[in-house]
């Protein structure tokens, strides 16, 4: 299978990215512009264009028609750039302070021109370095509560929502999640990647039919529950942050899926960072886990009471039941994320940079055990505190 490009598609380089910015009139005329390709992800080129005289900058992001991490042997649709720019614009309608502003997009060139966020740091990098970002979980809880509610059936007329489901159909990137999060880590698949010292624990997982059945249920929900427009890849590497500011980026995996998925992915990545820390240094992560759920629950509930179009919205117990369902699935999805980030294709630096090696293996084993417990016991948790306490118990705190 070869790489497919649209007739007008042309891969940008630093000079052509500058030419595009000039053509679009995004800088004052006769500005002297510098450009640097700064992308460190698997799927895109990212150009930082800077006008030193006026101290202005922007980002030009272009999707490439293959996964950079693999090469042209893994072709990917460039339509994901349309998905990303459309998702950012829609998210910006509800939380403009939490996403980058989009200035321009071109579907055929798979280009999105957006606000420069280089004054911020990728949250995963900062957390690994020991930063705690006091407002991170409150901001992400608000992002989740508003974006997930206002794109759902609770807030939209059915015909409008169905048009959005169509607009954000994203089969190729969903396929990546379906395989790398919900399938391959639970079987002896060649995409898996783990240290040989983990093999006994990995094979224990592969031989656990009970957890496989529960993972299958979660996968089915991901496949079939078109509840709302989700980000689809909301980990700490998809967030820029500082002590006071938070911006969610990279929603190219966006589609209509289960509300709990984004919630669970973010929570899992907080726990992954906690595993990279020791003792009291984990406490800020536990506080973030608690805060993100509480803020999401509060924000979602306020939006429900204020703006729900569902005729059943005011029936006593309906909101409570809805939140309980979201919570249960979120913890299950978090378990899948913990496992796949430990033994799947795409690891996280939180675990892979732990030293010495024996300590790293021990923490990865704990990630597998915690992920398995979250999947199997998700219906038993009543509060987010229950989840945190189980995590503490498993990591021997």
From Swiss-Prot:
The scientific name of the source species is: Bacillus subtilis (strain 168)
This one is known as: Methylthioribose kinase
The UniProt function text for this chain reads: Catalyzes the phosphorylation of methylthioribose into methylthioribose-1-phosphate.
The answer to whether the entry has keyword S-adenosyl-L-methionine is: no
Q: What is its EC number?
A: 2.7.1.100
Q: Name one GO molecular function term.
A: ATP binding
- Residues binding substrate, per UniProt: 233, 340
GO BP annotation list:
L-methionine salvage from methylthioadenosine
